[in-house]
C-alpha cells in the first residue's frame, strides 16, 4: 500500500496537523513524502482507494483506462460492513465485492482533504481514514 495525490506537492512532508494526528495513532509519518499519482502507479495497482469524487473524476480524465480500479475508501468500508459474511478475502477481489454488494458511492463516504484546513478537519480526516482502513483490514485478513 502506498499514497499518492492528484495535486501533490511532490517531495513535501506530510502536513504538520496530519502528521500530528498520525503520531497520535502510533504512525510515524516523518519519512512520508508527497508524490503525484501517475499512470505507472495506477498500472501497478490492483486497487486505488480514493477519498472523494474529485479523485475519481481526475483518474477518469487523465487515465481512463485505470478508472475501473478506483473505489472510494468510505464506499468500500461501508460495503464490507453491510455484508461482513460476503466480504472480500483479498485486495484483488475488493472491487468485485463492492460491486456485487451493490453499494453505490454517497456523499457520506467522502473524506475531505485536510491540507491547510485546520485541526478539526485533520482530526476528522485521520479518524475516518483509520476507521475505514480498520474495516478493510479486518475484512481482508479473514
What are these regions (language model features)?
Residues 1-142:
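Short polar/charged helix/loop
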